[in-house]
Amino acid sequence: LLLQFTNMRKQFRYLSFLFVIILYSCSNTRKLAHSDNGKIDVNFVLINDVYEIAPLEGGKTGGMARVATVKKELLQKNPNTYMVMAGDFLSPSVYNSLKFEGSRIRGRQMVEAMNDAGVDLAIFGNHEFDINENELLSRINESRFKWISSNTFHQTANGVVPFAKTLAGTAEPFAKTYIMTVQDADGTTARIGFMGLTLPFNNAGYVNYTDLFATAQTCYNQLKDSCDAVVAITHQLMEDDSLLALKIPGLALILGGHEHDMRYGKVGNVIITKAHANARSAYIITLELNKIKHQVKVSTRLQMINDQIAADSLTDAGVKKWMSIGEKNYAALGFDARKVVMANGDPLDGRESMIRTQTTNFTKLIIQAMKQASPESDLVLINSGSIRVDDILQMPVTQYDIIRSLPFGGSIMEVDMKGSLLLRIMAASLKNMGIGGFLQYSPELVNVNGTGNWSLHGNPIDPDKVYKIALTDFLMTGGEANMDFLKKDNPEIIKIYPTHTDVTDARSDIRLAIIKYIAGLKP
């Protein structure tokens, strides 16, 4: 019995020892599994040039609620996932001409959608400065995302200062550079530096720019020694992004905007990405950082945003609220926003880069619609700045697409004017090439051999002859560039015909004229 007891004690000691060994081994394995391996991945969801919060093309493409879903799904796999807006989101938008709670909406719907969708970082685009100073400051204060502004500043009566977000009475100036610290599950940490660069295109009086490339170099020099990677978020032409990559080859990545069609480029080791406008796609970019080897690898994937992606419920609820607000406004003006007006055909080109220098199929359609609305006119004119969509309209085209293309609307006026005034107007149009004051006009009016000598129906414009002209009411205010002379009291205007306000008359709103014209086209 004593011998049996002794053997049992030995077995117990052996089992206890074995248990301790196993426990230590498991603990050590667990520690090894969670030890810092020096590697960390960071995801960016890039969108840019987004003017529409809801899906387009009959609900097939785009939609901020779908972008929100893309980010949330990536977050489930990697908590180091961030959404970036590379400029142009407050304007142009049809909402900017509408009122809610007594004030013009002016991008309020977009900031709310961006907040709900989970945008983390944003920079200015040139169109942010289309709205006035107080409106922009209000949108900034409503935003819950971080702004980075390296070369764009607030011109005030007291001098040039950073733009700032004011919360609870405290102003938080926008940073010229920003360092994001990220950490993964095994404890690897990394620092990513950012700069935000905007092309100096919009010269609003409350904006001041510094030289983009010089500023970028200064920002990079400030960031490079304290960060594992430096990223430039930009809003400029692809050619300028390529030049930036050439000038600063140490950049890890350029997240860009401004062009409305997707762009991808590589200059040296610098990857450049831009998504399609209006969230028809999002670029998914992964920075793979190896801190041990001091290496940065970039992988990219273009994610089309379409009806195969479910809408995030929170974001979608906000979008539907604003859609309802918009539709009530449109209905009061005689529009059925969701009605399809053109089911098929070639996409309509309303890009500013095209319509402010030449005619497109969209501008031709608008001119034909104006002529149909004013059949007795000798000539029709519209300033290209009236067309604000800055995009290509894909089929099907709805009434809403027409509304958002010409958000300011306005009536078609008819006036009799002397040929001398018409010649002066057309000379100003040539001077305005590249800006909104460049005119679109009837094809019967020809600039003979590009000389500035104009003919109508093959006959030279007679300075003393009176011509009946149909034109947008804005042109008659003298507010267009180099056309301050074009006002109702100009002595060379012989007659102004009564303005038509009845919505049954296509001349009451140029958008109604376009919709009516399209409805009469043969399929």
Enumerate the language-model features and the residues they cover.
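C-terminal motif of bacterial Sec signal peptides marking the signal peptidase cleavage site
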Residues: 23-25
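Catalytic centers of hydrolytic enzymes
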Residues: 32-41, 52-55, 68-72, 76, ...
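Acidic, metal/ion-coordinating pockets
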Residues: 27-309, 315, 357-369, 380, ...
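Leucine-biased recognition of intrinsically disordered, low-complexity hydrophobic segments
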Residues: 1-3
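Bacterial N-terminal signal peptides that target proteins for export
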Residues: 6-15
